[in-house]
Amino acid sequence: MINLIDSPGHIDFSYEVSTASRLCDGAVVLVDAVEGVCSQTVTVLRQTWIEKLKPLLVINKMDRLITELKMSPGEAYTHLSKLLEQVNAVMGSFYQGERMEDDLRWREKMEERLNAAAEKTDSRSSSILENGDSIDTTNTPAEYEEKDDEDIYFAPEKNNVIFGSAIDGWAFTVRQFAGLYEKKLGIKRSILEKVLWGDFYLDPKTKRVLSSKHLKGRHLKPMFVQLVLDNIWAVYEATTGGNNGKGCVDFLPLRDLSACIIAIYLYFPLQRSCFG
């Protein structure tokens, strides 16, 4: 059983977000695919950082990229990449701020230890030197240990990013599409999860995954565009018209215009993607 606590997104109710976060083990952070990172997004992310919650990023309203902004799948991929960079920049600022505070505390602590050691050395130096002994200076303070920041960032290949449309009831992760294409492409799911997002391309002839440096001048679509976004765009173009403004009304009855979008929902229901 999963208990969900819905908190208001308006900045005037940030205290309610703060209260709710203290009752939770994790947080589902929604970001509008069109509007991107706003002040309230930063506030919510900061609260999850302070409370040490495990955040899950949901890029919502993906349908608006198609129906309102009229983006192509390639343009949408570039837009989503920049949005993800903005969110991770916020997380990185939290990490850097905490690191600077930890570094300052460590330096203060080391300074206290050195001062205490110096006082002890001064009190015993005269007797040690009279006996002809040397002073041990090998006991130096340990160096500051850097914390690994790899786990604080959002990345689709880590399965902590969900793309979806709440109004149409669908959402998906890279892991789900990797499961769909595993048998068709003959590539292990664990490998597909790592290459479905980023600068990776599928060779249509050899069915091999290529990095950008092995393209050799060929203009291939990123795998996320080719295997994921192209399919979703095709569904919306067949029903709502997508970025063309015309749906395929000629061969789809009016009552079935949303049938394909329902099919996306059946494959990738929002609740399963978030909590499955």
Model-derived segments and spans:
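Structural and coupling elements of P-loop NTPases
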Residues: 1-276
